[in-house]
Amino acid sequence: MEESILNAHNKEEYPPMHTAEHILNQTMVRMFGCPRSRNAHIERKKSKCDYLLDACPSEEQVQEIERRVNEVIAQHLPVSYEFVKRGEVPPEVDLWKLPDDASETLRLVRIGDYDLCACVGTHVQNTSEIAPFKIISHDYIADTHTWRMRFKLAE
């Protein structure tokens, strides 16, 4: 394939947190059937993600999200990249957040057999590089069906 051209990325990310966010997104998709986060703010110390949900998850569900994310992290899955043309993206990859001016060549990030997502961000090479995941708070805005979760990685 010819040399790939990617859109410029506008921020420096903390790879363990960014990869944890991908695992969290796939966990939410699997547990609730919702889209990946509609809004995310990923930082080294703590991060947040917003999800469109019909109801606020119960405390048991919140604990289960945390447990499942940590279970995936503990599997020591490889993180790999592949470059594909937009028309060749597998159907399970959601492109709704892709900007209109995105290049024709996309980079897909694969976390073992757990997640596959178009992304230009930085990631770890293996989930063994991610510290345990902890949900630190969450709230639900009924008017917009938005569940906001704040999380961190153990230090």
Where are these regions (language model features)?
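Active-/binding-site microenvironments in catalytic and ligand-binding cores
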Residues: 1-155
